Amino acid sequence: MSYINFSAIILAAGRGNRMLSDTPKVLYQIGGKFMLQHLIDSVMQVGVSSIYVVHGYKGEMIIKEINTNQYKIPVYWILQHDLTGTGDAVQRVLPFISDDEEVLVLYGDVPFVSYKTLQRLHVIKSQCDISMLTATLPNPKGYGRIVRNQEGSVVSIIEHDDIINDDQKKIKEVSTGIFIAISNHLKCWLSTLTTHKSKNEFYLTDIIQIAHQSGYSIHTMCPDDTFEIMGVNSKSDFVDLDKQYQQRKVQCLLSSGLMIIDPNRFDLRGTLVHGKDVYIDINVIIEGHVSLGNRVKIGASCILKDTIVADDVEIYPFSIIENTTIGFQSKVGPFVRLRPGTELKEKSHVGNFVEIKNTRLGEQSKVKHLSYLGDAEIGNQVNIGAGTIICNYDGMMKHQTIIGDDVFIGADSQLVAPITIGKNVTIGAGTTVTRDVAANETIISRIRQFSILNWKRLKNKK
């Protein structure tokens, strides 16, 4: 459902000085996605008619990295030339929003507020002039405090740096900075803001006191989980938030039947779907979209990215797999690298220290030791000996290799592409193949072994 008179403003212009980084804070990734992208994805489900993102520090980088073409709701980028505070940032957007429109204000470094929480906040707005998201924290350090009068009404927000007495320090209810108000009201309140001397900035939070003193009603609500309002101001904050995100994802996967042997040593940087009786050992990283069939086993320290794995596959430790499809009952690893465009058909076997790129390996085919295969179509029941190399690059272009069914390739062979090897061919160990080979042939190109009589090896004099 989309509301015609309801827009969102996301503030993402700050430098993030405490991050001590050249990368804009909102472009740090959690779970394989930029923090700002997480937030936009959530807001898209709230029902707003448009989203305005205020950018400033390295805004061009932010616009380039954030994918907005995937959304049906328009996302507009608004530049804040001078970084003079959150109050000024919102003022930059309001000329583009009609006076009677409701405005949801959020922060790009608070990425995990849920759409359900925001929908509840929108419902509360129908009962008041400002609906605010607050939280009660055992340790509110760093957050602005909610000040209430004796009747319990919100009268102001005191920023952490402006706390001056013990009573204010004891306040546990904090401001998340997230609220909804009418555009015309915001314009009036913001027009009366003055800068804070300590930072020479306009604080958006000051509008709460202005609104209260003008007789406007302010209601609050808390999220179900304080994880939703966790923000990032430093590298330490980022690590804490990422850890909590991973813990929640792991619990969901465990609840769905996935066996993760050590939840503290598993990293999900995308999405994972899985079948039954799947086992994941320690230090496994999942990136992009990964699909695991039934009874899949993944050994320690593997990385899987954008990969589809069929039933009963075993992936042994230290294998790195990207954009690959692995067939039924195949075995991979240890120490294997499968690069984009690789397809392993059922019951194939790729072993120690093998690299494969843009290659189809047929059913029951094996390449078990120390090989590189690139840009190849390899048939069924092919045995590729240890140390075999497909020479697919001539310095300018990549070339294809085609290998038929039932081929045996001896150890330490080189296949110089472009080349076609027919069915049932046998290639002797140490052979360099430079021309096409017809079906059923046996070839060898190495020199014959011979002895040199009476030859003495030179030795160093001691």
Curated annotation (Swiss-Prot):
It comes from the Bacteria. NCBIfam families: glmU. Homotrimer. Residues 257-462 are annotated as: N-acetyltransferase. GO terms for molecular function: glucosamine-1-phosphate N-acetyltransferase activity; magnesium ion binding; UDP-N-acetylglucosamine diphosphorylase activity. This is Bifunctional protein GlmU. Acetyl-CoA binds at residues 386, 392-393, 429, 446. UDP-N-acetyl-alpha-D-glucosamine binds at residues 11-14, 25, 80, 85-86, 107-109, 144, 159, 233, 339, 357, 372, 383. One of its GO terms (cellular component) is membrane. The keyword Cell inner membrane does not apply. Gene3D superfamilies: Hexapeptide repeat proteins (2.160.10.10), Spore Coat Polysaccharide Biosynthesis Protein SpsA, Chain A (3.90.550.10). It catalyses: alpha-D-glucosamine 1-phosphate + acetyl-CoA = N-acetyl-alpha-D-glucosamine 1-phosphate + CoA + H(+); N-acetyl-alpha-D-glucosamine 1-phosphate + UTP + H(+) = UDP-N-acetyl-alpha-D-glucosamine + diphosphate. Keywords: Acyltransferase, Cell shape, Cell wall biogenesis/degradation, Cytoplasm, Magnesium, Metal-binding, Multifunctional enzyme, Nucleotidyltransferase, Peptidoglycan synthesis, Repeat, Transferase. It is found in: Cytoplasm. Catalyzes the last two sequential reactions in the de novo biosynthetic pathway for UDP-N-acetylglucosamine (UDP-GlcNAc). The C-terminal domain catalyzes the transfer of acetyl group from acetyl coenzyme A to glucosamine-1-phosphate (GlcN-1-P) to produce N-acetylglucosamine-1-phosphate (GlcNAc-1-P), which is converted into UDP-GlcNAc by the transfer of uridine 5-monophosphate (from uridine 5-triphosphate), a reaction catalyzed by the N-terminal domain. Residues 1-235 are annotated as: Pyrophosphorylase. The active site is at residue 369. GO terms for biological process: cell morphogenesis; cell wall organization; lipid A biosynthetic process; peptidoglycan biosynthetic process; regulation of cell shape; UDP-N-acetylglucosamine biosynthetic process. Binds 1 Mg(2+) ion per subunit. Mg(2+) binds at residues 109, 233. In the N-terminal section; belongs to the N-acetylglucosamine-1-phosphate uridyltransferase family. In the C-terminal section; belongs to the transferase hexapeptide repeat family. Its main location: cytoplasm. Pathway: Nucleotide-sugar biosynthesis; UDP-N-acetyl-alpha-D-glucosamine biosynthesis; N-acetyl-alpha-D-glucosamine 1-phosphate from alpha-D-glucosamine 6-phosphate (route II): step 2/2; Nucleotide-sugar biosynthesis; UDP-N-acetyl-alpha-D-glucosamine biosynthesis; UDP-N-acetyl-alpha-D-glucosamine from N-acetyl-alpha-D-glucosamine 1-phosphate: step 1/1; Bacterial outer membrane biogenesis; LPS lipid A biosynthesis. Its cofactor is Mg(2+). Residues 236-256 are annotated as: Linker.
